[in-house]
Swiss-Prot record:
A zinc finger (C2H2-type) spans 212-234, 240-265. This is C2H2-type transcription factor ffmA. Belongs to the krueppel C2H2-type zinc-finger protein family. Residues 1-50, 68-140, 164-202, 288-316, 468-493 are annotated as: Disordered. Disruption phenotype: Reduces the growth rate, impairs the production of abcG1 and leads to increased susceptibility to itraconazole. One of its GO terms (cellular component) is chromatin. Signal peptide: none annotated.
Length: 493
């Protein structure tokens, strides 16, 4: 077997396993790199473009003279219908070598049929890894990665294969998918125009499954708003319009996404939103202006009666006391108490009956007493006349009818005579009918006149025991009371 002649062609790489002598040496040598990706000669489903950077043919329809090389099997793009003789000479002089020497894809002797010329390649070989439809060209040329038509390529026609229409990306194409046709036998939809509103669409009643059926097709929807959105596909209405570019959309969410980009591209100097339709905005402003006019007229024709000072009870009172009216017949409260007896008030300001803190003959003194400054109820002198009128109210019927109320923290114990002047008056201390509220006459006159006032709030841990001695009023800490010590010290003196 003759050895390959590497000296005749120094421009070819040594890695090629088999070379052939030139059959027609008068032709110019063309570089033929190993660019046919190792496929059999006639495989229309694979790409057959060489990797050279120049056009092989000037015209795809004219037959080409055979270009033969001294390298290994020439690519299929360099063969034509006229090179049967070259293939016969190859099969006679050089039988096929073993498979371990020659690549399995380069044994072209098993395919003696004529090979069709490939279409001329495009000048954009760098986008072979891109998917189809990634770009569109305005000159109408097909994409270089598009598979050509093998039938047209075999006939020498169709240089660019089957042409695809150029794909143009439309902003908001989600709402432009076309009008859905109606099912035969259903009612044809009535269009409202391109800018029709979606609110005047009549929603049919629910079917047996509790869903809303479409009157134009066989679809059903669980919610009425979804059916409304679907009906826009039948009518072709696009009720939502962009105020910046006057483009219309079928749904508000599509318009919102478009408006965010459109305001960046075109600018939004007025600060309008995606739902600021010009006509709707005009109607809204007119309605608001009409409402403001009606409101101003209503304020002008308002009542001439001056308003009160903000206290509703002041209009019913006999006279304002300290700026607050306390009416004899307040409208919000009834004169009859639900518990059967009169609830006592504190300092005459409770919400009982109107005159519950005063005798019937003392109602005229209400305003003058409340206008005077209050005195400490714990240091009241029983001999004075002015406070005595409010402390010793003549209520014989109430004191006889009601039992004495006992404070649980201060249990009442048997003690001295209630009428005794030197001891504590327990009935007057816890008298429920007393109008001064908490405790009346805690200290006797002898203690309150010359001694320092003792704290009225006594500790709850100590217990009161009545004394058996008749000593002076200052014995035992309080008059007539023995304070038991809570410590281990003794009697607490």
């Amino acid at each position: 077997m003759p050895m390959p002649q590497y000296t005749m062609q120094p421009q070819y790489p040594v890695s090629q396993p088999h070379t052939l002598p030139p059959l027609q040496p008068h032709h110019s040598q063309s570089p033929a790199p190993h660019s046919y990706m190792g496929q059999p000669p006639y495989r229309p489903d694979l790409s057959r473009y060489p990797a050279s950077t120049h056009d092989v043919y000037a015209s795809s329809a004219a037959p080409i003279m055979p270009h033969t090389t001294v390298g290994s099997l020439p690519p299929s793009t360099f063969l034509s219908h006229h090179n049967h003789q070259a293939q016969a000479q190859q099969s006679q002089h050089y039988p096929p070598p073993p498979h371990n020497v020659l690549p399995p894809a380069s044994s072209a002797q098993t395919y003696p049929q004529p090979i069709a010329p490939a279409p001329p390649r495009d000048r954009r070989p760098d986008f072979n890894g891109m998917p189809s439809g990634a770009f569109s060209y305005p000159d109408g040329k097909a994409s270089p990665w598009m598979n050509p038509d093998p039938v047209a390529a075999a006939n020498g026609a169709g240089a660019y294969g089957a042409k695809e229409p150029p794909r143009t990306q439309v902003v908001g194409s989600q709402g432009r998918r076309g009008i859905l046709p109606s099912v035969p036998g259903r009612v044809a939809p009535v269009t409202n125009g391109v800018n029709g509103t979606a609110k005047n669409t009549t929603i049919p009643a629910k079917d047996a499954d509790g869903k809303f059926p479409c009157p134009h097709c066989n679809k059903t929807y669980l919610h009425a708003k979804h059916l409304k959105r679907h009906l826009l596909r039948h009518t072709g209405d696009r009720p939502y319009m962009c105020v910046l570019c006057k483009d219309t959309f079928s749904r508000s969410d599509i318009l919102k996404r478009h408006f965010q980009k459109c305001s960046i591209r075109r600018g939004n100097p007025t600060g309008a939103t995606h739902l600021s339709h010009p006509q709707a905005h005009l109607k809204r402003s007119q309605a608001q202006a009409a409402a403001n006019t009606a409101k101003s007229l209503q304020e002008e024709v308002s009542s001439t009666v001056p308003p009160s000072n903000g206290i509703a009870g002041a209009t019913f009172s006999e006279g304002a006391v300290n700026g607050n009216g306390l009416g004899a017949g307040r409208p919000g409260f009834t004169d009859q108490q639900p518990l059967g007896f009169t609830m006592q008030s504190v300092n005459g300001l409770g919400r009982g009956q109107p005159d519950d803190a005063y005798a019937h003959g003392q109602a005229h003194q209400r305003a003058s007493w409340m206008a005077t400054p209050k005195q400490n109820p714990y240091l009241v002198q029983p001999g004075t006349e002015a406070p005595n009128q409010q402390l010793n109210v003549d209520r014989p019927t109430l004191e006889q009818a009601k039992p004495s109320v006992v404070d649980p923290k201060r249990p009442m114990m048997p003690g001295p005579d209630p009428n005794h002047g030197g001891g504590l008056d327990w009935t007057s201390m816890f008298q429920a009918g007393a109008s001064d509220g908490y405790i009346n006459q805690v200290f006797p006159q002898s203690m309150a006149s010359g001694q320092e006032p003792i704290q009225a709030q006594v500790e709850t841990e100590r217990k009161f025991y009545p004394t058996t001695t008749t000593a002076g009023p200052q014995e035992g800490g309080m008059n007539g009371l023995y304070l038991a010590s809570t410590t281990l010290g003794g009697d607490g003196k």
